[in-house]
């Protein structure tokens, strides 16, 4: 079982600075204790290419005079802290400079490669060269010498490469280097070879060591990669470019994978990795770790040890402020499974394209609406969910289309948007509507047939629209076109032409258990964020789910609501989170002051009357009413994170 309070201790250290001079086992242990840390990832080899222990395979850091890795492992063992070992896989700057034939060549353009080689950063090596054997030898050396509890391999991904070896091997296989599909296929073959070789290097010496290959993102639907790991670590530093909504999206997918244990990896830095002297406010770290545990994950906090190798006391006092709270909450975390009403069939998993924005927009709408949801791929059992969302894109396999049809035929509720229900030029589910093709106008306008914040007027929709004609059901939105598309020949004002009110078409329909929205609202929401996109989706959800929604909590849009089940303890845990973020500097979203919420009204659908409802870990009872299969209660205060236990008699 993964531990919940981990630190990822980066140690990428130049050969031009002293290393290890200040290391003290006692100081190292004292800081880990102050941080309430129960697992720390320590370094065998860094991105610079140096080892931090005696080695016959690689080269020890030229300024290191003792076995630093061995000393760290011993220190951790004495205090019961686990210590997986880190080995940089994709980067090895020392070998990149020494071995040109091992270099990853991202382009056949020699000038582009020369410019890349001069850039001041780490450079990538190719796994289709002798470097892979070199890497595996390093892994085996660590396994034999230290028998660690786990191996963490970093900077890995399928890559197209134009190095001499890759070009030669592609030709030998009859693949065309000029063909993009062939290049990507060969890149995946090389990546698969890397996964197999490195895993074998671990498994030759241990059946129990954990293995994780880090690429900074968990690719949805890619089981060749997912299954190569014993667990998953979701690298997601909100201030490091990932943002505060990346982790909930990634977690909502990963927690659906059978038997998958996972961590949410944030950092103590103000910005991101490698920032010596950068600290976020304790409230930010408290929120980020609470977000991890509320989404079913353990926690991992990134730090970077000073080259002199003494841990920074301020850092571990900061970490301790967050992890002391996580430690108190652990009895309500182990074995907890997230409950979800809604499944989103991930656009990334369907298309294989990480850059599609539909998942991002859907995640934001669901998060802001405080709905219980998961992201799933085509392998999921849709029948577990009350509502299936099909966002914007249509690239489903025949098997997936049949599963969606079966789900609908059995009464499953569906909301589909944009192209999601279209296959071979028509809707693949009969919901009383006929597909009429892609609208030639963009943007278009949406006019609601229901109450909205700004009333019954025309709202611009900066996205594509599919025309359709429904003969059954409730039309809950209509569509209007602009007078014309903006071109050099004709344009109007600064942005786009106004709506033409003389013509109005069907825009969204609900018929029975199926809702269809003609616009790509999720992609548009991720890009533009118009409130009307969310209002359109929210109306459809509430119309279809009604009183079946498991949790309703009156929270601001930045609030987060999750709900978990501990079967063994016969209880559910309601997680309520709220933090106010603000932008500091250039696009750095930070959390500083807490803004408590008071008297938060909650309504939870229950199979039977709870025996008690309690604030935990404080063990403060809450009064509640049980009406129409719903427990109604008020949470007096939410200050960053609040957990509510809903318990039942056995």
Question: Where is each model-derived feature located?
Answer:
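N-terminal small/glycine-rich loop or linker at the start of catalytic domains
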Residues: 1-15, 110-122, 257-273
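N-terminal structural segment of carbohydrate-active enzymes
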Residues: 1-49, 79-81
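Carbohydrate-binding surfaces of carbohydrate-active enzymes
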Residues: 2-3, 31, 39, 66, ...
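Short, solvent-exposed turn/loop segments enriched in Gly/Ser/Thr/Pro and often Arg
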Residues: 10-12, 41-48, 87-94, 152-162, ...
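Short, solvent-exposed loop/turn and secondary-structure capping segments
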Residues: 18-20, 52, 88, 94-98, ...
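Aromatic-lined carbohydrate-binding/catalytic grooves of carbohydrate-active enzymes
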Residues: 28, 33-68, 91-118, 146, ...
């Amino acid at each position: 079982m993964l531990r919940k309070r981990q630190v990822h201790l980066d140690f990428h250290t130049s050969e031009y600075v002293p290393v290890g001079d200040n290391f003290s086992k006692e100081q190292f242990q004292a800081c880990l204790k102050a941080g309430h840390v129960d697992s720390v990832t320590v370094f065998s080899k860094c991105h610079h290419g140096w080892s931090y222990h005696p080695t016959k395979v690689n080269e020890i850091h030229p300024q290191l005079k003792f076995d630093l890795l061995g000393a760290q492992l011993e220190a951790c063992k004495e205090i019961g802290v686990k210590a997986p070992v880190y080995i940089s896989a994709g980067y090895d700057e020392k070998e990149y400079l020494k071995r040109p034939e091992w270099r990853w060549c991202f382009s056949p353009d020699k000038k582009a490669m020369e410019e890349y080689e001069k850039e001041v950063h780490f450079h990538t090596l190719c796994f289709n060269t002798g470097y892979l054997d070199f890497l595996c030898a390093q892994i085996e050396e660590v396994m034999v010498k230290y028998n660690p509890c786990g191996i963490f391999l970093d900077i890995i991904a399928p890559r197209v490469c134009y190095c001499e070896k890759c070009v030669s091997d592609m030709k030998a296989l009859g693949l065309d280097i000029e063909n993009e599909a062939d290049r990507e296929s060969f890149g995946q073959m090389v990546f698969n070879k890397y996964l197999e070789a490195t895993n074998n290097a671990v498994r030759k010496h241990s059946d129990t060591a954990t293995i994780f290959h880090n690429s900074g993102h968990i690719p949805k639907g890619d089981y060749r990669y997912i299954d190569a790991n014993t667990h998953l670590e979701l690298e997601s530093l909100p201030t490091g470019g990932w943002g505060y909504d990346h982790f909930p999206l990634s977690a909502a997918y990963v927690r659906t994978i059978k038997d998958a244990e996972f961590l949410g990896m944030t950092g103590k830095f103000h910005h991101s990795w490698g920032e010596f002297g950068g600290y976020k406010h304790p409230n930010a770290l408290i929120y980020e770790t609470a977000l991890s545990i509320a989404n079913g994950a353990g926690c991992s906090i990134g730090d970077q040890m000073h080259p002199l190798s003494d841990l920074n006391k301020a850092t571990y006092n900061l970490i301790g402020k967050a992890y002391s709270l996580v430690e108190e909450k652990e009895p309500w975390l182990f074995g907890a499974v997230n409950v979800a009403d809604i499944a989103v069939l991930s656009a990334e998993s369907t298309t294989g394209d990480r850059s599609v924005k539909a998942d991002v927009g859907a995640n934001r709408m669901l998060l802001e609406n405080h709905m219980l949801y998961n992201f799933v791929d085509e392998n999921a059992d849709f029948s577990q969910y009350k509502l299936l969302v099909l966002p914007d894109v249509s690239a489903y396999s025949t098997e997936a289309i049949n599963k969606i049809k079966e789900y609908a035929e059995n009464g499953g509720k569906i909301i589909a948007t944009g192209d999601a229900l279209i296959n071979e030029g028509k809707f693949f589910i009969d919901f009383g509507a006929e597909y009429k093709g892609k609208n030639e106008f963009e943007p278009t306008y949406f006019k609601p047939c229901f109450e909205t914040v700004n009333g019954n007027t025309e709202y611009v929709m900066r996205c594509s629209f599919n025309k359709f004609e429904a003969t059954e059901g409730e039309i809950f939105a209509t569509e209007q076109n602009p007078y014309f598309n903006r071109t050099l020949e004709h344009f109007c004002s600064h942005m786009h032409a106004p709506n033409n009110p003389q013509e109005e078409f069907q825009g969204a329909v609900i018929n029975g258990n199926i809702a269809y929205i003609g616009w790509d609202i999720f992609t548009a929401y991720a890009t533009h964020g118009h409130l009307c996109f969310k209002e359109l989706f929210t109306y459809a959800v509430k119309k279809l789910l009604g009183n079946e929604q498991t949790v309703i909590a009156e929270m601001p849009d930045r609030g987060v609501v999750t709900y978990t089940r501990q079967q063994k303890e016969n209880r559910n845990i309601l997680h309520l989170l709220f933090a106010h973020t603000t932008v500091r500097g250039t696009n750095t979203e930070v959390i500083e002051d807490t803004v408590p919420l008071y008297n938060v009204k909650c309504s939870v659908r229950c199979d039977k009357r709870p025996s008690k409802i309690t604030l935990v870990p404080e063990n403060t009872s809450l009064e509640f009413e049980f009406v129409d299969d719903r427990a109604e209660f008020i949470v007096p205060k939410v200050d960053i994170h609040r957990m509510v236990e809903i318990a039942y008699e056995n």
